[in-house]
Swiss-Prot record:
InterPro entries (UniProt xref): Brnchd-chn_aa_trnsp_Livcs (IPR004685)
Disulfide bonds: none
Family listed: Belongs to the branched chain amino acid transporter family.
Main location class: membrane
Name of the featured protein: Branched-chain amino acid permease BrnQ
Organism: Lactococcus lactis subsp. cremoris (strain MG1363)
NCBIfam families, per the entry: livcs
Location in or out of the cell: Cell membrane
Sample GO molecular function, one term: L-isoleucine transmembrane transporter activity
Pfam families to which the protein is assigned, alphabetical: Branch_AA_trans
Length: 449
């Protein structure tokens, strides 16, 4: 039994974890945010890094110090039924319903679509989806090979290709960040808007989901002691989030500079294609196609493996390959509704789920303060759940928001919760729930004595 990982293992596992995290949204959202934030990009980028880098790292630390095998075990500290519901919902969101279809559509719209005529778009998206998820299924059949597939091969290739475009773009900028117009949403609350934009990467959710893969990989390298696994998980995570922070910052500033040459695009995928074509023409588009397909494929492999391993844990009557087949077929179908529509549909669900995930992560980190009392977990989560429902409803399309029951909830929330209009209404209730939970916990201890 090994006492710790070798130096090269940290590098490979950190590379694998980065590769698992860095997929579709990680490329397109910071660029689009940069275009809209303009000269306010420094504040917006800082907010983005908090949710897109800070919370995923806290999620890795939470899994490490709690010595949990994954999100289900962590969520049982609230309640076992809640753990089932939360885990299933989380994996459906980052699996077949939103994240996985988004990976295929992003790959297609950035890497393939620019080379096709309009009439070929729909049939070839269907064909591409089959090929994409067929390849991801093939690579996911043996979870023990993930370190080789992603950490040693796909991710280094991705970094080299992306680095090439970033070096060219920053050495010959499209425009000045300081001359870029600040969008309406970013004029008064750039940090907060950047913060909620970071939700779209799904990485705080993914940190909880990928925990099972990281821990399994470290065990495969010969480390068996739970406390040592916890430390090694955090060390490997530090390499991953460091890389993410650097690349996010480069992409967001690239987006802000690009408005010196291009109009703000419908989504970051279009902007990235325009930038690559401007600098390198057809060759640039080919490189970009490779970057995006590799980025999305490696994340798809990780998500499909994590989904299948977790569902075996939740429902052990079926084997790994059964769940792998399900998580290959469903997103292949959903991918055909298009990237912009997938993003639009996912926002209300993310606004509901993210506060619950962040709260769970923070409770796991603060657990020693209140002796990991179930009562504190339950009261804090209950308070957060109320606000998370309102945040999710607030992100619905306007026709649904105008329905009387929903409108009544939203009007009450706007009047009662600070930062609600910015998608942050859950913070006050989460803090209040935590304080009440701790008071009840410590009063019970004193009474019992």
């Amino acid at each position: 039994m090994k006492e710790k990982l070798a130096g090269k293992d940290y590098l490979f596992i950190g590379s694998m974890l980065f590769g698992l995290f860095f997929g579709a949204g990680n490329l397109i959202f910071p660029i689009h945010m940069g275009q809209e934030a303009g000269d306010a990009i420094s504040q917006a980028n800082f907010g983005f890094l908090v949710t897109a880098v800070g919370f995923p790292f806290l999620g890795i630390i939470a899994l490490g110090i709690s010595q949990s095998n994954g999100v289900f075990e962590l969520a049982t500290r609230v309640n076992r039924i809640y753990a089932y519901i939360f885990t299933i919902l989380l994996y459906l969101v980052i699996g077949p319903f939103f994240a996985l279809p988004r990976l295929a559509t992003t790959s297609f719209e950035i890497g393939i679509s620019p080379f096709l005529s309009n009439k070929l778009q729909t049939p070839l998206l269907a064909l591409f989806s089959i090929l994409f998820f067929g390849t991801a299924w093939f690579l996911s059949r043996k979870p023990t090979k993930l370190l080789d597939y992603i950490g040693k091969f796909l991710n280094p290739l991705f970094l080299v290709l992306l680095g090439l475009i970033l070096i060219i773009a920053f050495s010959h900028p499209l425009g000045s960040v300081h001359q870029a117009e600040v969008g309406k949403l970013y004029q008064s609350s750039a940090f907060m808007n950047g913060f909620t934009q970071g939700y779209n990467t799904l990485d705080a959710l993914a940190a909880l989901a990928f925990g099972i893969i990281i821990i399994t990989t470290i065990r495969q390298r010969g480390v068996k002691n739970s406390k040592i696994i916890a430390k090694e998980t955090i060390k490997a995570g530090l390499i991953s989030v460091g890389l993410m922070a650097i690349i996010y910052t480069c992409l967001s500033y690239l987006g802000a500079m690009s408005v010196g040459k291009f109009a703000i695009s419908e989504n970051g995928g279009i902007a990235l294609a325009q930038i690559s074509n401007y600098y390198l023409g057809t060759f640039g588009m080919i490189i970009l196609a490779l970057i995006v397909i590799i980025a999305c494929l490696k994340t798809a492999v990780g998500l499909m493996s994590a989904f299948s391993e977790t569902f075996v844990e939740l429902f052990p009557k079926r084997e790994y390959r059964f769940y792998l087949m399900i998580v290959s077929i469903l997103p292949c179908i959903f991918a055909n509704i298009g990237l912009t529509k997938i993003i639009e549909l996912s926002v209300p669900v993310l606004m509901f789920l993210y506060p619950l995930a962040i709260t769970l992560i923070l409770l796991a980190l603060l657990g020693p303060v209140f002796q990991h009392s179930k009562l504190v977990y339950q009261i804090t989560t209950a308070f957060t759940l109320l606000a998370a429902i309102a945040d999710g409803l607030n992100a619905l399309p306007n026709p649904l928001k105008s329905l009387k029951p929903i409108a009544a909830i939203l009007n009450f929330s706007k009047d009662s919760l600070p930062f609600f209009s910015l998608g942050m209404g859950w913070i006050l209730l989460a803090v209040l729930g935590f304080i009440i939970g701790c008071l009840v916990h410590f009063l019970k201890r004193i009474t019992n004595k």
